[in-house]
Structure formats: C-alpha cells, structure tokens
Amino acid sequence: MAGELYKWIMDATAGAPLPFSLALVAAAFVLYNIVSIITTAYFSPLSKIPGPWYAKLTDLRLTYSVFAGNRIYYVDSLHQKYGPMVRIGPKEVDVADPAAAREVHRMGTVFTKAPFYRLLSPGPVDNIFNFRDQKKHSQRRKLYAKGFTLVELRKNWESTINKTISMAVQKMKEEAANGDTELMGWWTLMANEIVCRLTFNGGHGTVEKGIKDPFVLMLEKRKGDLAHLLKMFIPPLYYVGRVLGKVNTRMNDIFYSQEKMFKAGAGVVKSARQDKEAGEFNQNLFAKALQEGEGDAATLTDTDIITDAGALLLAGSDPTAISLTFLIYLVLSRPELQKQLEEEVASIDGEVTDTVCEGLPLMNAIIDESMRLYGAAPGGLPRSPPAGGANLGGYYIPEGTVVDTQNWTLHTDGATWKEAQTFDHTRFLPENRLEFSEKQKMAFNPFGQGSRQCLGIHLGRLEMRLAVAHFFRELRGVKLAKSATPESMAVVDSFVAGVPRDRRCEVTMKA
C-alpha cells in the first residue's frame, strides 16, 4: 500500500509547483496514517479481542500509565472489566489466563522477547537478559548456567553470601537499637556486594563501608532512567536531551550514562581476564564463562562482559532488595506471625545454612506468599509472535503484535486464588501446596518460566532464605517505624520493577 501511494504521489506531482507538491505530500501522509489507524483498529484480527474503544486507536492512555507509575493497576482494571484477554493498545494485548500465559513463556515457545527489551540493555549490544534470538540466548546462558546452579552456589559462594548478609543485618541491628534503620538501602547494598563478588570479584567492602562499587554507581544512572523512557516513547525528546547533555551536567549524566558506565566497567573486564589467567574460576563468574567459551564462537568480548555485568547486576540486586523489604513489612504488620517466624528461625541449631533454611516450612511459605503479592517484577513481560502470527487463548495474534503477561494480575486473580488480595502464607505451607490446582501452578511464576526464566532464581531464593533467617534471629522483636505505613509501602510500577512508593521502609528496636 505504501509503495502504491508513493508511486501515485510521484505521478501526481510531476511538473507541479513546489507548494502544491508539498501540500499533496502532507495530505497523503495524513490520509495514509488515518487509514492505517482505522484499518488496525477495526479490521485487524485484534479487533475481536475485547478492550476499551480508545485502545484500538491509540496507546496514549497506556503510555500515560507508564509515566504515572501505575501501568500494572491500569492493565489489571481492564482485565477486571473485559476478561483474561484484553487489547490495551492498537497492536498490544495483555494475557491474564494462566494457560495462555504458560503458552507464551513455556520451553520451546514460538514467542520471542519483544523489541522493547533492547531498551533494557545497559550497553550497545544485546545481553543475557534481552537477546531476542533464541539460539544466541541459549549460547550465552550456557556460559553462565553452571555457576548459577544451587549446588555450585552452595559449594563456592554460600560462605561469602552468608558473611555479607550477616554483616548487613548487624548494621541494621546497630542502627535500630538507637533509632530507625532503613531496610531497602541495606538490602540493596547487600545484594550489590553479593552479585559484584560473584560476577567479577568486585564490590568488596560495599556493606562494611556503605559505599557501592563504582561500576554499580554508574550503572544506576543508566538504569530505568528518563533517557530509556524517552527513547522508547518520545524519540525526538531523547535526541534533544543528547544535544543538551553536551552543555548541561545533569543532562549529561542522564543521556550519556552508557558511555560513562563503559568507562567505569573497564575494571570489570580487567578482573575477569586476570582471574581467568590465574585460574581463579571459583572467584569470578566471568572468568569461568571466558574459560567455557574459549575457542568458541560464543566467547565473550570486552563489550559483552561489561554489558552482561550490568544486566546481571540490575536483575540480581534490586529485585532481591525489593522482595526482602516487602516481606519484612508484611511480617512486621502481623505480630503473631512475626513471633512464629522468630521462633522457627531461633530453633536452628548451630550455623545458619541454606540447606537448613530450605527445610523451614513457615519461612518458605512466607517467602512465596510475599512474592505472590509483592514480587519485584509485577509488570508486563512483552513478547512477539512469530512470522505469520499465532493462535493464543482462542484468538489469532498477528505478526507485529506485542503480547504481555503481568504477574500483578496472574498472582491476584480471584478466579485462580481464594481471597486473592489477602496475604495468607498458609496457602504455601507444604500440606496446602500439594492441593494447588493446575491453574495455580501455572499462574505462580515470580521468577518467570521456560527458557527465559530468571538465570539467578537459585541465587535469589538462597539470599532470601538466609537474609530472612538472620534478620529475625538477630532483630527479634523489631517493629515498623511510624514512617512505614500502607500508603508509603504501596506498590509503584517503576518501569521495570514494583517498588514501595517512598522507596524505603524503616524499622526500629526502640520501645
């Protein structure tokens, strides 16, 4: 259609005055876009999928919800009104049916990560997190997979992780004894140090000194910032920002963060390659990966190392800190449950190990229920159907559509969960979990599922188990500070994570 229109314009303007030609081109452009909008809205296969009338014509309402930090609530409200399959934009659909969501994410699925994920790369190349090509993702994941198994983590890293967590908890305990201590900040430092140590042997002393690794500091300027949002939704403003960044320091920090991050990342590469040459594979995940990929097409370049380090830090730090913060808030809001948990972890005889913690039924039920309601990634996980489209949930999804699934809805759907909005850890106790319906099993995926399941699922769970055990052993009787309220802890959808509104949660040991 576009080619035919172009030919018609060229024929119509041949020999015509310039003003007439420009006016005709402008009119044709407007007409073409109007026809495209109407065709997509009312004649696409997506027209059969229910949704608000305006979503067929524009994604402005959806975009507004992203900037307002309430996309998960907006999309969930559409599911409440229109059902498990809802059209949320001209070429975007959200799926809340557990079986259909499983089809989108299962092993061997025909759906791939949507172009949106290119924005989430901290570097100029694709990384372990955002590869759209399944083969390339599989090759890269294979380089890291062994280092992230539970067996390897316990064997090589549990001691380091335990010491780091213990130190963070002691810092909280010292502060809480004299006033308020802020949980999310300490959990973030803890998670930063653990991931830095594991990936590139960095981050030493992060918790002890209360100062993040330089690479992490630069990465945070790159993460989920205004530049990412503008590049995705309003590209012209992104390029204006790049120009202004040449003369304004603050704008430079935002719009040139990638370049600065790579400068700070030189130490990551140096550490990885030095440890590889020294054979210190247990001390550096990237050293292991370099060894695994030596002589192979999948071997890592310096750019790959920095970009993957950034991706692993983003995926491995904030989610753990956020999840622990919400979990402790939920427990401290329920004094009787707090006492039960304190008694369970106090019953540990001897050293606190992950093997022991994995066998604590109450603690693990609390962890799962907190992640059901307040998982760190409640928002959409956009995917693209294959060439030629695909059938999903009783509808045909054409090529070029974005298909989302969001845990905020899957984890709180009343059709799947009894008293879905209520925190009830007992549903995850071993005897009750055995009674889970197939629908519940498909719906509960706080770490994702299929071949794109979180690479650090075992690390995340190990950290949470040890952190919860240490915290409630050392800070027995801790209470929420006055600043920690339901309002301050309301979930805000911050583009890639669900965070407390005030981005903090204070507790105290003082009477």
Swiss-Prot record:
Ranges annotated as spanning the membrane: 18-38
EC number: 1.-.-.-
Keywords assigned: Glycoprotein, Heme, Iron, Membrane, Metal-binding, Monooxygenase, Oxidoreductase, Transmembrane, Transmembrane helix
Listed pathway(s): Mycotoxin biosynthesis
Membrane topology, record value: Single-pass membrane protein
Annotated GO MF terms: heme binding; iron ion binding; monooxygenase activity; oxidoreductase activity, acting on paired donors, with incorporation or reduction of molecular oxygen
Pfam families xrefs: p450
Disulfide linkage: none
Cell compartments where the protein resides: Membrane
Amino acids binding heme: C454
Glycosylation sites noted in the Swiss-Prot or TrEMBL record: N162, N407
SUPFAM superfamilies: Cytochrome P450
Described function: Cytochrome P450 monooxygenase; part of the fragmented gene cluster that mediates the biosynthesis of dothistromin (DOTH), a polyketide toxin very similar in structure to the aflatoxin precursor, versicolorin B. The first step of the pathway is the conversion of acetate to norsolorinic acid (NOR) and requires the fatty acid synthase subunits hexA and hexB, as well as the polyketide synthase pksA. PksA combines a hexanoyl starter unit and 7 malonyl-CoA extender units to synthesize the precursor NOR.
Protein family per UniProt: Belongs to the cytochrome P450 family.
Designated name of the protein: Cytochrome P450 monooxygenase cypX
Organism: Dothistroma septosporum (strain NZE10 / CBS 128990) (Red band needle blight fungus)
Gene this chain is encoded by: cypX
